[in-house]
UniProtKB/Swiss-Prot annotation:
PROSITE patterns: PRION_1, PRION_2. Keywords: Amyloid, Cell membrane, Copper, Disulfide bond, Glycoprotein, Golgi apparatus, GPI-anchor, Lipoprotein, Membrane, Metal-binding, Prion, Repeat, Signal, Zinc. Monomer and homodimer. Has a tendency to aggregate into amyloid fibrils containing a cross-beta spine, formed by a steric zipper of superposed beta-strands. Soluble oligomers may represent an intermediate stage on the path to fibril formation. Copper binding may promote oligomerization. Interacts with GRB2, APP, ERI3/PRNPIP and SYN1. Mislocalized cytosolically exposed PrP interacts with MGRN1; this interaction alters MGRN1 subcellular location and causes lysosomal enlargement. Interacts with KIAA1191. Disulfide bonds join C186-C221. It comes from the Eukaryota. This is Major prion protein. It is found in: Cell membrane; Golgi apparatus. GO terms for molecular function: copper ion binding. Glycans are attached at N188, N204. GO terms for biological process: protein homooligomerization. It comes from Saimiri sciureus (Common squirrel monkey). It is linked to Found in high quantity in the brain of humans and animals infected with degenerative neurological diseases such as kuru, Creutzfeldt-Jakob disease (CJD), Gerstmann-Straussler syndrome (GSS), scrapie, bovine spongiform encephalopathy (BSE), transmissible mink encephalopathy (TME), etc. Cu(2+) 1 binds at H68, G69, G70.
Amino acid sequence: MANLGCWMLVLFVATWSDLGLCKKRPKPGGWNTGGSRYPGQGSPGGNRYPPQGGGWGQPHGGGWGQPHGGGWGQPHGGGWGQPHGGGWGQPHGGGWGQGGGTHNQWNKPSKPKTNMKHMAGAAAAGAVVGGLGGYMLGSAMSRPLIHFGNDYEDRYYRENMYRYPSQVYYRPVDQYSNQNNFVHDCVNVTIKQHTVTTTTKGENFTETDVKMMERVVEQMCITQYEKESQAYYQRGSSMVLFSSPPVILLISFLIFLIVG
């Protein structure tokens, strides 16, 4: 790992050195190094706007074709199409779309921003279910094809599998000492929640249903455990990689080149 980090450091130093030097070189010339300027910023010999208030053909400061300070086509200071100082579409001083100005629009409270970090964490680990003490609801799964040892139960399962859970409730794998504890807890909570929810809708389960649900949910909880264990291992490996000294040194050097 240390050798890999050192080689990566050498490669990026060679790649970014020229870029860092080029960013610090002064560039010749620039915009507005001479020529016309706005009033009050003039330089000797530079062009300036005329000091008198009138525009072309206006004796008293008006716009084009306006004798008394109005905008285009307005005799008394109004905006375009407004005779008395109003904004666009307002005859008496209102802002755009409002008769009393636009300042009230800027006093509205801003909408709260969504915390993207929390959203990303919920999407990666599953949605936390309120009222279940930290349990999360896994993504939907296809119900496994299970054989129960006799034709009657196999046929009953195929005909009623849609009534059984397609998602399981679970806690993070790091809260359990082994897979069996995770699966046992996952099965109990999932069946209890599904039974209570379904019973409130007026549907009851027989002993055969409960027996089949236990087998189905057990397989789904095992699948969920394998998925969560793999994700937990990958997160741990990433933390080890980015905490190694060569990688930290490399990242610090890149930040220095970009910012400096």
